[in-house]
UniProtKB/Swiss-Prot annotation:
Any one GO biological process: antigen processing and presentation of exogenous peptide antigen via MHC class I
Keyword tRNA-binding: no
Compositionally biased residues, Low complexity: 37-47, 416-427, 782-791
Species this protein is from: Homo sapiens (Human)
Region (Disordered): 22-47, 407-427, 662-687, 723-791
InterPro entries attached to this UniProt entry: MFS_assoc_dom (IPR024989), MFS_MFSD6 (IPR051717), MFS_trans_sf (IPR036259)
Designated name of the protein: Major facilitator superfamily domain-containing protein 6
A GO CC term attached to the entry: membrane
Compartments where found: Membrane
Length: 791
């Protein structure tokens, strides 16, 4: 029955079948052959659809790769959830009452945990062939542990008077002046307080023992006044026990020892400019420890999700690994849209804060629970989409073995000293030796300086990711501004990712690093002098150069310097330095610096450090690195580049299975041939065409001027003598040395018409000088034609 159906296929159906075959996904994965029963209904249904509808479906739907579509949708939802929450976490921690150092630790420790846990879970997934289970469990941990942070209750706010700069903050000593109504005296009291705070009542019991002196001025109306250093004045009850030990009279009379108890109650609140809001530090410490535990546990179990999805996506792509950026682009699109939408939504939501005390203006706190709700919904959608991923371990194993079989001969061809009949033991020893060679290569001055720049750029990016919005909020920036900044930075990164290889081929890897460091210097110093938060937008465009182009240049530079079998290790080291160690140190060390010096001063300091590193790096590259031709001709490879939030995704995990499909071709220089020589060999180019070589054009112009001057003096055939002279004349003539191939002069009959006498002299001198010039060894028939043309 199936044979009859195949036999009656029309030409149109054959064409449609061919299109379906061509539209098969180009992922390089060998699909298992499906039974013919599944293919037969599809052909029957196709024949039943009208032609116009078939054309529309073919143009819009048939060529869609379902596997890559799942990857695109997952990246969109995952990074939408990530972008809606994680950039705002430092600002959220600030609202909870944490210091910059605490916030930096909570953000920076994630990178170190991801660096350690992502490879661990990747090995577990490959070893037990449970990639989908590990992926789904990881995404579930993303939802649960991050939503737990949103239910943390903020610390209590207290309204306290500002600390005077002249008082001593550690030893609580208060100077109390009391003037009673019956008599006038001034007592200088040294008070050692023991304070007990509650929410609405602060009781201070002061045990005072000091000397009381009677002044001479009588009848002074006075009120009890209190100048405390710390504590709350409103609703305060103070019990003063005055134990006067001695009395020094100034006027006649004496004061005997007495014990007096004075109760002072004040209800007057200070002005708003003399009070400030502080958090209860004990509650802040408790909140910090709770969130730290949640972050450590949650990141350990959830860090492997993006690594696994990247690996599956690269398996779907197969030999078209350069199209990874097209899949990852949807994640950046979702990040920008989610960040902008959430930022606008938060600006219109506020929460009321209960303040312990009076006299302070309530702060405007935003409701960040919306962020956690949006994160939970989007990450749940990513979890649902992740259930559609297909893991083929048998295929991966077969391709891995094939890749090893092809890779070993490639290594043997590269190493001329190794024989082609090496044993597996020798091969493994060679691979270990090559790994140590890689370590030595990366520790050299040339590549070690590049790795240091990669680490420092990661340091700067981690600091900006954590404290840029923190600083903008200090300048009264809104979350809408944060969303606009996110959109600009992601558009800049995408543009830089897709055009970075052309920029590298144009100016080179090292110059791209120069530009990135210079842009970082300008960006950080500009941010440090901001007065209006919205003026930061022009500098957000530099995000693509300072992050994307730098990352692409570093990974391309190292990948082109190491052999293919060690490229995965080199990229892993670079990712660890840039994405893991660099960003983690930037967030944690930057938090300590902001805590001590402030955000503006820290931005300014890191900007100056970028300038110093730029100068040192340029000096090292100028003095210590040889300027070789290989470095100039090194081409940028289109290596898939992960964007900012990818947690150490080993992009080259499937390196072995792609080397046999798409081997790396070393760039070879073309044979050296000047442009002038190519023009001389081109018989179709007219003789009056300008040469591309400037010095040849200049000499040729001088020669033509000299020739025309000779024509004006003597109208006889003097123009042929310089073009076809003897060896002595040609060696002494600079024009003859400049134009070693004057064959093209024959292509212009109007300029090179020989006279009869010259033609006759040529026929006489050419046998005598057979080696004068290849152009003079012409046949007698050609000489006769030239002579005839002269008449």
């Amino acid at each position: 029955m199936a044979d009859d159906k195949v036999a009656i296929l029309t030409d149109d159906e054959e064409e449609q079948k061919r299109k379906y075959v061509l539209a098969d996904p180009f992922n390089g994965i060998s699909r298992e052959p499906e039974p013919p029963s599944n293919e037969t209904p599809s052909s029957t249904e196709t024949s039943a659809i009208p032609e116009e509808e078939i054309d529309w479906i073919e143009k819009h739907c048939v060529k869609i790769n379902n596997d890559l579509l799942i990857s695109k949708v997952f990246y969109f939802f995952f990074y939408s959830a990530y972008g809606s929450l994680y950039p705002l976490l430092p600002v959220y921690y600030k609202q909870l009452g944490m210091s910059p150092s605490q916030s930096g630790l909570l953000v920076g420790i994630r990178y170190f945990i991801e660096f350690c846990s992502a490879p661990f879970w990747g090995v577990v997934a490959d070893r037990f062939k449970k990639g989908k289970i590990v992926l789904l469990f990881s995404l579930l941990c993303w939802v649960l542990f991050n939503l737990g942070i949103g239910f943390v209750k903020p610390a209590t706010l207290r309204c306290v008077p500002k600390i005077r700069p002249t008082t001593h903050p550690t030893n609580a000593s208060h100077q109390l002046t009391i003037l009673p109504t019956n008599s006038s005296f001034t007592s200088f009291l040294t008070i050692s307080p023991k304070m007990r705070e509650k929410r609405n009542l602060l009781e201070t019991r002061l045990n005072v023992s000091d000397t009381v002196t009677l002044p001479t001025a009588p009848n002074m109306n006075s009120e009890p006044t209190l100048q405390p250093q710390t504590g709350e004045i409103t609703n305060r009850m103070m019990d003063l026990t005055l134990n006067s030990s001695t009395a020094t009279p100034v006027s006649p009379g004496s004061v005997t020892k007495e014990t007096t108890t004075v109760i002072v109650t004040t209800t007057k609140s200070l002005p708003s400019d003399q009070v400030m809001l502080v958090y209860d530090q004990q509650e802040v410490e408790a909140i910090f420890l709770v969130i730290l535990v949640v972050v450590i546990i949650g990141e350990f179990f959830s860090a492997s999700s993006v690594t696994i999805v990247d690996t599956v996506t690269l398996q779907y792509l197969g030999k078209h690994r350069d199209r990874y950026g097209l899949q990852r682009m949807w994640g950046s699109l979702g990040w920008g849209l989610a960040m902008l939408s959430v930022g606008i939504g938060i600006d219109y939501t506020h929460i009321e804060v209960l303040i312990d005390g009076k006299g302070c203006k309530p702060p405007e706190y935003r409701n960040y629970q919306i962020v956690f709700i949006v994160f939970g919904v989007l990450m749940t959608m990513a979890l649902i989409v992740a259930t559609q991923f297909r893991f083929r371990y048998n295929h991966f194993k077969n391709d891995d073995s094939k890749g090893k079989e092809v890779e070993i001969p490639q290594v043997e061809r590269n190493n001329s000293t190794e024989s082609s009949e090496e044993t597996p033991t020798t091969t493994s020893h060679s691979q270990a030796f090559n790994f140590w060679d890689l370590i030595k290569l990366l520790c050299s001055v040339q590549y070690g300086s590049v790795l240091f720049v990669a680490w420092f750029m990661g340091f700067g990016y981690g600091f900006v990711f954590t404290f840029l919005y923190w600083h903008l909020e200090d300048l009264n920036g809104t979350t809408t501004l944060f969303g606009v900044c996110s959109v600009l930075s992601h558009v800049s990164e995408l543009t830089a990712y897709f055009f970075s290889h052309k920029l590298i081929e144009l100016i080179g890897h090292i110059r791209v690093l120069y530009i990135g460091l210079a842009c970082n210097t300008a960006r950080y110093i500009y941010i440090s002098y901001l007065e209006n938060a919205w003026t930061v937008l022009p500098m957000e465009v530099l995000q693509g150069v300072t992050h994307a182009a730098i990352w692409a240049a570093c990974i391309s530079y190292l990948s082109a310097a190491v052999p293919p079998e060690l490229r995965t290790s080199a990229q892993g080291i670079l990712q660890g330095l840039h994405l893991g160690l660099g960003r983690g140190c930037g967030a944690m060390i930057g938090g300590v610096l902001v805590n001590y010096f402030g955000a503006a001063a820290t931005f300014r300091g890191i900007g100056m450090a970028c300038l110093v590193i730029l100068l040192l790096f340029a000096l090292i590259q100028w003095l210590a690195v040889p300027d070789e031709e290989e470095d100039k001709t090194m081409l940028a490879e289109r290596i898939p580049v992960p964007s900012s939030p990818v947690p150490i995704a080993t992009i080259d995990l499937v390196q072995q299975q792609t080397e046999d499909v798409m081997p790396r071709i070393e760039p070879r220089l073309p044979p050296k041939k000047t442009k002038h020589q190519e023009e001389q060999e081109d018989v179709n180019k007219p003789a009056w065409g300008v040469s591309s070589s400037p010095w040849v054009t200049f000499v040729y112009a001088l020669y033509q001027i000299k020739e025309m001057m000779q024509l004006t003096r003597d109208n006889r055939a003097s123009e042929i003598q310089p073009l076809q002279g003897t060896n002595e004349n040609r060696e002494n003539s600079p024009a003859g040395r400049a134009q070693p191939v004057p064959c093209e002069t024959h292509s212009d009959p109007s300029r090179n018409q020989p006279s009869p006498d010259a033609a006759a002299s040529q026929t006489q001198t050419s046998p005598a000088h057979p080696s004068v010039d290849p152009c003079t060894e012409e046949s007698e028939e050609q000489q006769a034609q030239l002579a005839a043309g002269g008449h």
